[in-house]
Amino acid sequence: MPEPTSNTPAMDGVVLRPMTAADLPHAHALSAELRWPHRPADWEQMFANAEGIAAERDGELVATGLRWLWGESHATIGLVIVTPACQGRRIGHRLMSALLAGLEDRTVLLHATSEGRGLYERLGFVRTGEVRQHQGIAQPAPLVALQPGWRLRPAGLNELPALQALDAAARGMPRDALVAELLQSADACVVLDHDNEPVGFAMLRRFGRGHSIGPVVAPDAEGAKALIAHLAGLNASNFTRIDIDFDSGLAEWLESIGLLRVDAPTTMVRGGPLAVPQGGPSLFAIVTQAVG
């Protein structure tokens, strides 16, 4: 990514520079300071396909932010953290300006906390929706009955191109490298078939305090429930998290299987709406709030 324009100390002594893998232990410490659940392994996985900016003061990491470039027209931004001791000093604004450098022709997506929303609005982001974070000890969910011609089955590694195409259609941006990494590392990936053609999929992955279900791509809410119920059953009696779209229609059902709502970050976009084809699959649950 371009060198930050603030690579000389500002009046407060803060220097922005490209983030490297050597920063990850310190970045994890920053997120832990805010009580975010990310493990060191979660940081490593998210950084693998990212570009990052680190903010230092007196040789100490005080802020981070990552961006992911998808194709030629899209990007996501996440894991924007400023240590509480340095908040209120416009470090977040300088960090975001550096992350947005060179993205003027891209549609940029992020999920905002209530604390960060005002900053993102000042930088040109607009609210497009909301994510509902549900989590808890998953209860065995009744399996969702599928109509004739529909079935669930395990995904094979040779199906990567089909899963990448489904994800791109549902998310509105091509994320081939991310889907490839997730398929390799997921504890389970289940595919929803209709007439022997894949029309949806979902993954169960180690993340944070336990496991996370996501992404979940399906043609409709019943298909999404079938995928989620299967994976929640695999992880029954264990901590499970899922981040769903506000309009998914799944919130009440998720609470019935023990996954209660705990947060509701705002979905924001800069540079125009995401183009999701009508009649195609929908993204019912995101990967993480950082990467979308």
Which residues does each predicted region cover?
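Conserved catalytic-core motifs of GNAT/GCN5-like acyltransferases
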Residues: 107-111, 126-140, 261-273
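N-terminal, Lys/Arg-enriched amphipathic/low-complexity engagement segments
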Residues: 38-42, 46, 66
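Short Pro/Gly-enriched beta-strand edge/turn motifs at strand-loop
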Residues: 34-39, 172-175
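Intrinsically disordered, low-complexity, positively biased terminal segments
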Residues: 1-13, 20-25, 45, 56-57, ...
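Surface-exposed beta-loop interaction hotspot
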Residues: 128, 133-160, 167
